[in-house]
Regions:
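Membrane-interface alpha helices of multi-pass inner-membrane proteins
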Residues: 172-188, 194-201, 232, 237, ...
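Perimembrane helix-loop-helix junctions
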Residues: 5-6, 10-13, 193-231, 296-303, ...
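Short periplasmic/luminal acceptor-recognition loop of GT-C membrane glycosyltransferases, typified by
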Residues: 176-178, 195, 384, 396-449, ...
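Hydrophobic/aromatic-rich transmembrane helices and adjacent perimembrane loops
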Residues: 192-193, 317-319, 323-358
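Hydrophobic, aromatic-rich transmembrane alpha-helices
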Residues: 107, 279-317, 342
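Transmembrane-helix signature of polytopic, membrane-embedded enzymes
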Residues: 19, 109-133, 151-152, 165-171, ...
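Membrane-interface transmembrane helices that cradle and orient dolichyl/undecaprenyl
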Residues: 157-175, 202-210, 287-305, 346
Length: 549
């Protein structure tokens, strides 16, 4: 009798949709956290360090572009500045913020599915697919990059657009436009997503499904409200920088510099890399990609509005990925479209089975495929490898683990008033140590490449700032990827800096770049430090200003 009662209780649990739904959400969150756990402490890569440092500058009252230079849109810096209110300037702190921030994106995508008349199971399958895809090494989902950051306002913009149609609300249309603008002000390629959201809301509004439910006031009224939100936020961003006295710098580094940056990119030559990255993504996540593509093909074949909208969203996502150097983190922009397609596609596939028990078993099997295949293919990333080993695997020979050693030394041997100049692009040293740069040029390649007409002027400006600030420490990063000299630009700044260092500074520490992490070398005799690092190809050298200089 007890065994029969146990079976009845078990079946009652699986027949209760509320309990099943709650258990499914618990499973999704456990999988989401579990997939990210091993990568939470990966040393920050170059962009993360730069975003974090500029976030610190903002918190100290500074202004991006005027007080610290990068050529990304400003949104990401302010998001980092907000994150630093709660999270420490460490790899684990930044990546814990990403874990929570990205969880909001996951929930927003679930909301998009439900607002698009998807079932709870389609929403959960979308959430699971996004949990897996967004943590994937193929998209460098462990890094708090602009690509990962823009996904939340993108998902919220989609959800707001659907709410605007459902509620016949111009306020939600305005919010959708403003959120789409936020995507653009996090990464310029977000313009493809903004245009897509605008087109999708018009397409969905005209669909028979929504026409039968509730009419919007008019297509023109909705479009006007959406555009008003988009331009209101954009004008607010531009106006803010001009009011703060940084308008010219904002204009140059966001648009003029990026024009020259784009001239150094050849899309044709990046196609093999693009193709290889797409193949790797498909190989690692065959169930998700297959279900998403199947959903799109079926939707187009039967002229289903959701399938057509997913096709447009997927094309826009690819358009956002293509410009540039096809770096792996660019492909994070594909994850929402693929996750939505997988959620709807897997639901359609499993609903073809008539038996409820068989359908539940098929759903469980699909979920195992979604999660199990990528983990089985890359156990090292998800379970075995250390944080430093993962950093070297993805970014070698970049000295990202070694920057922690350098930052720790500087933090312990200086005060917050002391300034540091880094000949290289390793702003994470400044971020970890909480020290200010002696120059606003914390990114070096605008000074070392001839495609930028003002590179020589910027060298002079950097030199003027260095001599005026008299930094306590000068850090020289002997890694090509940190300097990106094109072999043609006049390295006048480097020569001036080395003469300056020879006269007034002494070598006090060095970190050789080694696997998985080079260790700090210190000695009172600088000659012995130089001797110890002589056999290493890549190094970080730390010079301190002499007390009599």
């Amino acid at each position: 009798m007890k065994r029969k009662n146990s079976k009845k209780t078990s079946w009652r649990f699986f027949s209760d949709p509320v309990l099943v739904h709650a258990a499914a959400w618990i499973a999704v969150w456990c999988i989401y956290v579990g997939l990210r756990f091993n990568s939470i402490s990966i040393p920050l890569e170059r962009d993360e360090g730069l975003f974090g440092y500029i976030g610190q500058v903002i918190r100290d009252g500074g202004l991006p572009y005027r007080d610290a230079i990068d050529h990304k849109p400003p949104g990401v810096y302010y998001i980092y500045a907000a994150a630093l209110l709660l999270f420490p300037p460490t790899p684990a702190g930044v990546h814990l913020f990403l874990l929570l921030y990205n969880a909001l994106t996951l929930m927003a995508l679930y909301g998009v599915v439900r607002l698009a008349r998807g079932s709870p199971s389609a929403g959960l399958l979308t959430a699971l697919s996004y949990a897996v895809l967004s943590s994937s090494p193929q998209v460098e989902g462990f890094a708090a990059s602009t690509e990962m950051i823009l996904l939340l306002p993108l998902a919220l913009s989609l959800a707001s657009a659907l709410l605007a149609i459902r509620w016949s609300s111009v306020v939600m249309a305005f919010a959708s436009g403003a959120l789409a603008a936020a995507v653009v002000w996090i990464k310029h390629t977000g313009i493809f997503f903004a245009l897509t959201v605008f087109c999708l809301q018009l397409a969905v509004q005209q669909s028979a499904d929504f026409q039968r439910s509730r009419q919007m006031r008019s297509s023109a009224g909705y479009a006007a409200a959406w555009l008003a939100g988009f331009f209101a936020l954009s004008l607010g961003v531009v106006g803010y920088f001009y009011i703060r006295g940084g308008g010219d710098d904002f204009l140059y580094w966001n648009f003029i510099f990026n024009y020259y940056y784009g001239t150094g990119q050849d899309i044709v030559s990046s196609l093999p890399k693009l193709s290889a990255s797409l193949r790797a993504l498909c190989t690692a996540h065959p169930v998700i990609v297959g279900a998403a593509l199947g959903c799109v093909v079926f939707g187009v074949a039967v002229r289903d509005v959701r399938g057509l909208c997913l096709l447009l969203f997927l094309v826009a996502s690819l358009a956002a990925v293509v410009p540039g150097y096809a770096y792996p983190h660019y492909f994070a922009q594909l994850t929402p479209a693929l996750a939505l397609g997988a959620g709807f596609g897997l639901e359609r596939f499993t609903n073809a089975v008539a038996s409820a028990r068989l359908r539940q078993g098929l759903i469980a099997l699909c979920c195992c495929g979604v999660c199990g295949v990528p983990v089985w293919q890359d156990v090292g990333y998800y379970v075995r490898s250390s944080s430093d080993e993962l950093s070297k695997r993805f970014f070698s020979p970049n000295p990202f683990p070694e920057t922690i050693e350098a930052a720790t030394y500087i933090a312990h041997n200086s005060t917050q008033r002391d300034k540091v100049f880094i000949f290289g692009s390793e702003a994470q040293i400044l971020f970890y140590s909480r020290r200010k740069s002696a120059s606003r040029f914390v990114l070096l390649y605008p000074l070392t490449r001839t495609i930028y007409p003002q590179h020589r002027l910027h060298q002079q400006q950097a030199w003027d700032e260095i001599t005026q600030s008299r930094p306590t420490y000068v850090v020289v990063v002997n890694v090509f990827q940190s300097v990106l000299w094109d072999g043609k630009a006049d390295l006048w700044l480097y020569r001036q800096l080395m003469d300056f260092v020879a006269q007034r500074y002494e070598l006090v520490a060095a970190v050789p770049v080694a696997y998985p992490r080079g260790r700090l070398i210190t000695h009172p005799d600088s000659n012995k430090i130089a001797k110890e690092i002589a056999d290493y190809k890549y190094t970080i050298k730390i010079f301190r200003r002499r007390y009599d200089a």
